[in-house]
């Protein structure tokens, strides 16, 4: 006998399938509505140009990589990583593994190689328990790891876009990013649900 869904999970599913961006993504055969979040950021901040090298953290199911491919073209390169499986995308070199694992990080850095990266993007999020006191620190740990990745691979004047959940540690994290990049904006794309704590920090012009 199947388990009954909780009221909160049933509400989430109902909201999810009624979401116009979910419906639009399905209609256009896109991986996820995250595609539209990155599109809106690109229209405003112009992160991507043809021929760029991009790292995509928390890539599955592939919405961001799918969008970035359309912007960087056949001469560009995307190295993507996620703990979950992801169906192949032409132009994307995908590594499945837990980014928190040092061996996975080493494998990712090996794929990047000697060349510097133009854009690091992170849509990583932990499995949420529903308790902010647990979830926010887990989420902050992931975004700190993404910023550490920037410090290792990002080219001078490179860019970083990262999903962050507002809560304890957010202001300090934003302050650190502002010390490393010339221009920093906090964006809330239309495709991001209004009641979600998520925002996107867009950082341009890496100083080092």
UniProtKB/Swiss-Prot annotation:
Keywords: Cytoplasm, Methyltransferase, rRNA processing, S-adenosyl-L-methionine, Transferase. GO terms for cellular component: cytoplasm. It is found in: Cytoplasm. SUPFAM superfamilies: S-adenosyl-L-methionine-dependent methyltransferases. Its EC number is 2.1.1.166. Its main location: cytoplasm. It catalyses: uridine(2552) in 23S rRNA + S-adenosyl-L-methionine = 2'-O-methyluridine(2552) in 23S rRNA + S-adenosyl-L-homocysteine + H(+). Gene3D superfamilies: Vaccinia Virus protein VP39. S-adenosyl-L-methionine binds at residues 62, 64, 82, 98, 123. Pfam families: FtsJ. It comes from the Bacteria. The active site is at 163 (proton acceptor). GO terms for molecular function: rRNA (uridine-2'-O-)-methyltransferase activity. HAMAP family: RNA_methyltr_E. Belongs to the class I-like SAM-binding methyltransferase superfamily. RNA methyltransferase RlmE family. PANTHER family: RIBOSOMAL RNA METHYLTRANSFERASE, RRNA METHYLTRANSFERASE 2, MITOCHONDRIAL. Specifically methylates the uridine in position 2552 of 23S rRNA at the 2'-O position of the ribose in the fully assembled 50S ribosomal subunit. This is Ribosomal RNA large subunit methyltransferase E. It comes from Actinobacillus succinogenes (strain ATCC 55618 / DSM 22257 / CCUG 43843 / 130Z). The gene is rlmE.
């Amino acid at each position: 006998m199947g388990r009954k869904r909780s009221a909160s999970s049933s509400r989430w599913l109902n909201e999810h399938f009624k979401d116009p961006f979910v419906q639009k993504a399905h209609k256009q055969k896109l991986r996820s509505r995250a595609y539209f979040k990155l599109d809106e950021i690109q229209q405003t901040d112009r992160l991507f140009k043809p021929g760029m090298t991009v790292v995509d953290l928390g890539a599955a199911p592939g919405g961001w990589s799918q969008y970035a491919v359309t912007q960087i073209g056949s001469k560009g390169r995307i190295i993507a990583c996620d703990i979950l499986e992801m169906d192949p995308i032409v132009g994307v070199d995908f590594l499945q593994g837990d980014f928190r694992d040092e061996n996975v990080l080493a494998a990712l850095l090996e794929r990047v190689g000697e060349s510097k990266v133009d854009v690091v993007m992170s849509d990583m999020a932990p499995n949420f328990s529903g308790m902010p006191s647990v979830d926010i620190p887990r989420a902050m740990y992931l975004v700190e790891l993404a910023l550490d990745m920037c410090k290792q691979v990002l080219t001078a004047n490179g860019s970083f876009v990262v999903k962050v959940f507002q809560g304890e540690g957010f202001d300090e994290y934003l302050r650190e990013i502002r010390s490393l990049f010339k221009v920093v904006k906090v964006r809330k794309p239309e495709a991001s649900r209004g009641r979600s704590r998520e925002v996107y920090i867009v950082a341009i012009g890496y100083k080092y």
